[in-house]
Amino acid sequence: MPVAVHPGRLLRRELAARKLSASRLALELGVPSGRITDIPNGKRGITPDITFRLERRLATSPHFWTNLQTRYDLTVAEEKLGRRLAVEVRAA
């Protein structure tokens, strides 16, 4: 089973590489500070709205962030549901 890596971890690295704080990024993205500061801390996911804002500010693909978030969400769900589904759902 793959290890779940929250996309906020990669955002934290990106911010560090650009010497940019999460609060400053929030200001530049036009969103409340908490919406961004919670992402690197793993307390909030990256929404489609944020992906498009990151695309404009960081020149990254919105699909990059969306794919990271989806992969993380699926991995976490699999970890939570895996055993139960093996018992409850019959394989084809």
Region annotations inferred by a language model:
Residues 66-92:
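Short, charged recognition helix plus adjacent turn
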Residues 23, 34, 63:
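Key DNA-contact positions within bacterial/archaeal DNA-binding proteins
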Residues 1-20, 67:
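A short, Lys/Arg-rich alpha-helix, primarily the initiator
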Residues 16, 27, 56:
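Short polybasic/polar patches that bind polyanions
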Residues 30-46, 53-55:
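Recognition helix of helix-turn-helix/homeodomain-like DNA-binding domains
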Residues 49-69:
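DNA major-groove recognition helix of helix-turn-helix/homeodomain DNA-binding modules
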